[in-house]
């Protein structure tokens, strides 16, 4: 069972959660979009899509850490520069092997539960994420993976996938490298 308590301290909200699982959101971000290159750094109301998503994800009561995962390509240096300037955690890995990038980022952060989201979803509702995490942790069925993308019931841009590290590791070990 998970118990949550929100405390206000000097105008800031401190979230306290009783859970023995390290929960890490990994945000997939790249500049080389085919339809709208550089869209994750496009600004809406003075903030980039990545910044809006970061703010939204920080409102989650369940997430311990948020990582922006981008490629090692030079074109993605702009994402790195923004994240560094804003103090966001960033991981750089393979551009083509996204599964490898996620696995390495999750491993580096000792993640036990991973939330996969895309940086071009700035309006993602953190309560949806918290609800999905809660199901994964507390449901009597022993889930390894949850998604709200397989049977699209939420509006586009509210998509998330949540998995255990064991499920990610298994996918990483058994995926075809073709």
Annotate each PLM feature.
Residues 114:
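Short aromatic/hydrophobic "clamp" motif used to bind/position activated sugar donors
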Residues 75-82:
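Acidic helix N-cap motif at the loop->helix transition within catalytic regions
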